[in-house]
Swiss-Prot record:
It comes from Homo sapiens. Residues 79-82 are annotated as: Interaction with SF3B3. Component of the 17S U2 SnRNP complex of the spliceosome, a large ribonucleoprotein complex that removes introns from transcribed pre-mRNAs. The 17S U2 SnRNP complex (1) directly participates in early spliceosome assembly and (2) mediates recognition of the intron branch site during pre-mRNA splicing by promoting the selection of the pre-mRNA branch-site adenosine, the nucleophile for the first step of splicing. The lineage of its organism: Eukaryota, Metazoa, Chordata, Craniata, Vertebrata. It comes from the Eukaryota. The modification N-acetylalanine is found at A2. This is PHD finger-like domain-containing protein 5A. Component of the 17S U2 SnRNP complex, a ribonucleoprotein complex that contains small nuclear RNA (snRNA) U2 and a number of specific proteins. Part of the SF3B subcomplex of the 17S U2 SnRNP complex. SF3B associates with the splicing subcomplex SF3A and a 12S RNA unit to form the U2 small nuclear ribonucleoproteins complex (U2 snRNP). Within the SF3B complex interacts directly with SF3B1 and SF3B3. Component of the minor spliceosome, which splices U12-type introns. Within this complex, interacts with CRIPT. Interacts (via N-terminus) with U2AF1 and SRSF5; acts to bridge the two. PANTHER family: PHD FINGER-LIKE DOMAIN-CONTAINING PROTEIN 5A. Keywords: Acetylation, Activator, DNA-binding, Metal-binding, mRNA processing, mRNA splicing, Nucleus, Phosphoprotein, RNA-binding, Spliceosome, Transcription, Transcription regulation, Zinc. GO terms for cellular component: nuclear matrix; nuclear speck; nucleoplasm; nucleus; precatalytic spliceosome; spliceosomal complex; U12-type spliceosomal complex; U2 snRNP. The gene is PHF5A. GO terms for biological process: mRNA splicing, via spliceosome; positive regulation of DNA-templated transcription; stem cell differentiation; U2-type prespliceosome assembly. The modification N6-acetyllysine is found at K3.
Length: 110
């Protein structure tokens, strides 16, 4: 997700013991590069990103988590799994624009 949307911001605090989760839509993706190949290392997120209502949520989109998140083999070799907590903190401009467009034209989500 972050590879294709450069305006998304990662948390990047020191990772704790909590394991990152992925929703059905994001299941099987690498958290950093969005590839579906060779899952390798389990994703750890910081305690702040796993607190309260955020517990068990998808690391990428914030939906309800169904499976554990993994880094792919390439990201593990390049040591991108050691950069800190990979949880995406902001919405990004595309989702924000979509929200305001829907609000402007009066579309309701079913």
């Amino acid at each position: 997700m972050a590879k294709h949307h450069p305006d998304l911001i990662f948390c990047r605090k020191q990772a704790g013991v909590a394991i990152g989760r992925l929703c059905e839509k994001c299941d099987g993706k690498c958290v950093i590069c969005d590839s579906y190949v060779r899952p390798c290392t389990l994703v750890r997120i910081c305690d702040e990103c796993n607190y309260g209502s955020y517990q068990g949520r998808c690391v990428i989109c914030g939906g309800p988590g169904v499976s554990d998140a993994y880094y792919c083999k390439e990201c593990t070799i390049q040591e991108k799994d050691r950069d800190g907590c990979p949880k995406i903190v902001n919405l990004g401009s595309s989702k924000t624009d979509l929200f305001y467009e829907r609000k402007k034209y009066g579309f309701k989500k079913r």
